[in-house]
Amino acid sequence: MILSNRNGLKNTRNMLRVFGGLNETYSCTEAEYSAGINFSARNFPALSTRLPRRKLREEADLNGMYHLNGLLTVCGRDLVYTPDDADEMEVTLKDAVESGRKTLVGIGTRILIFPDKLAFDTASRKVSALGAVWSGKNASVEFAPCDAEGKVYEVSGCGPAEPDKPTDGQLFLRVEDPEKPWSSESTLEVYSEASGNWSAVVLDYCRISAKGVGTDFAAEDTVTLTGSAAEQAGQWNELDGDRIVYDAGTDALRVKADPGGEWFYGRLTRTGAAVRWVSLDGSVSREFVSAEVVELERRVPDMDYLTECDNRVWGCSNKENVIYACKLGDPTNWFSYRGIAADSYAVTVGSDGAFTGAATCMGYALFFKENTLHKLYGSKPSDFQLSSLRCRGVAKGAARSLCVINETLYYLSPDGVMAWDGSIPTKVSTALDPARLRNVKSALGGALDGRYYLHLVRGSGEAQAVRLLVYDTERGLWQEEDVCSYEMAGSGGQLYLWDGKAIWAADADREESWQQAGGIEDGVSFELVSGDIGLDSPEELYLSRLTLRLEAEVKSRIEVAVSYDSGAWETLAQLTADGRRCFDVPFVPRRCGSLRLRLKGRGQLTLRSLTRTSAAAKGGILAQEVN
């Protein structure tokens, strides 16, 4: 029997098993998706929904969050600290701060809180002020020359020559100029019977005495003294100004002060506006009036952006072009200049524009403007060096987007999301719609397992648009998750997020049971719109069949829909699973130029593969063998 000729079908079959991420540009391929929410690359090369989060506790008013040996949250005016150790109790400090947004940075066991200029110690669980101010408005304050031990002397006599028969320990003021007997040119001497000689007593310190004057200060502090009236009295030429505290008690402190002035050897007492000077032997006194008030202050500069590098806290403000660094290991002292390696540091930069952020990466303290990167490096103030690079810096309002992941710094610039690894910043957001990354009102960054979380806010009021983008730094893939990130804090092994109502943990399995408040999310709502499928087919091929391989990990419901040539969505299948289950969703698409697929539902879903079957066509009919 001879069979008649049959039409020859020329079909090809391709299976797509490696999926990319979000691509909002024209170049989005069928292996990527053009829009979607709550998908991740955790099961790469498959495409899976994100892991469910765990709710830790309700919190409606959060002004800041930081992790250091535990999670510190600024709740309104209160501080709440939850230690990592489950055996330790949570600590709440009422009315510890002012209400408002906070900038937090850690150094050692302390978390610094700005603009309040406070420090929370995670070891002692106490809050202390970084700066300190003491005012002598209603106090009696005495200034007296003293030696290195803080001792103040009284003399029994003075003159151009020492007494003939002195006693052991006798004090005498040897005068060089009889017209100025109490000036610093004279010399205070003490007699030693053992040696039979007079020796000079050096009074190169000043003892400041008043009730409570030393309560808030400590040895090695640098304080700014004003209103002493010492220069007016002629006792010290430059007592007012920055002074190093060498000893501090409750009612007295000792500062370094070089001798000087025509009335040096005496005690100066201020009570309100009245000033009285009395010589060391009590024979001479002078009185006058000064309108100033005595004040001692340990100053802390106003700073908007902070970072820790090499046991120093570095900071800058968007109101001035100065970069500050605190004293080595001491964030309470910012103006200590003694010429040693532990000194504070400050430098003025010459670039234009306001600072927009600060961070630490690769051992450098980095300070950004919108078009400039300033890099500070060195081991001590004497060899600190500042270099500047004109490049795409941090966008205005995006200071908190700065985040270090695997030795690379990520941040939002006016031109998109950048990555800096020590050389030139490179753009990593080419797959995202650039228009949705511009004119950002605020941006916040976080990190977990090599993923960069970027919270963006654009516009305000009803027109406000909020997004949470996630960048897989190892694979170079972008995803988008539902917004739960108005505040973020990372611990290295966990990322804490605040959605405006409660605090969540990004990875539920890493939280101890004692921290569970609301438990794990019962399901994750997801949606995905694929890129255009079929645009790469030549004219003589068309899609004859598509098969989706889906896997539900938990109880889930899934809707599969298709859109032909950017038309309306048509439902292909509605699937439900009571537990782990795999689905094959085949369908025959109608003739079209291109199509898109949409996956929508709730639960946990993994897209394993997409199989395309293409058939040959010619002139609108199946291709036949041509003799």
Regions found by a protein language model. Give the residues of each.
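Trp- and S/T/G-rich repeat-edge/linker motifs of beta-rich repeat architectures
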Residues: 40-59, 79-99, 121-154, 194-204, ...
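Beta-sheet repeat architectures centered on beta-propellers
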Residues: 2-70, 396-397, 407-408, 415, ...
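Short hydrophobic/aromatic-rich beta-strand motifs
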Residues: 71-72, 109-113, 163-190, 220-226, ...
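N-terminal beta-propeller domains
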Residues: 1-88, 142-150, 298-375, 456-470
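Small/polar beta-strand repeat architecture
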Residues: 4-8, 130-131, 192-221, 226-300
